[in-house]
């Protein structure tokens, strides 16, 4: 599992990284 800290808060912004959709 990748680090969740790579994702944006709430996964609303694409700038959080490629893992954003994974965390959602």
From Swiss-Prot:
Cross-link Lanthionine (Ser-Cys), sequence positions: 3-7, 13-20, 18-23
Modified residues (2,3-didehydroalanine (Ser)): 5
Keyword check for Transit peptide: no
Annotated transmembrane regions: none
Residues bearing PTM (E)-2,3-didehydrobutyrine: 2
Residues carrying 4-hydroxyproline: 14
Post-translational modification comment from the UniProt entry: Maturation of lantibiotics involves the enzymatic conversion of Thr, and Ser into dehydrated AA and the formation of thioether bonds with cysteine. The C-terminal lanthionine undergoes decarboxylation. This is followed by membrane translocation and cleavage of the modified precursor.
UniProt cross-link Beta-methyllanthionine (Thr-Cys), position: 8-11
S-(2-aminovinyl)-D-cysteine (Ser-Cys) crosslink, residue number(s): 21-24
Known role: Lanthionine-containing peptide antibiotic (lantibiotic) active on Gram-positive bacteria. The bactericidal activity of lantibiotics is based on depolarization of energized bacterial cytoplasmic membranes, initiated by the formation of aqueous transmembrane pores.
Protein name: Lantibiotic 107891
Organism of derivation: Microbispora sp. (strain 107891)
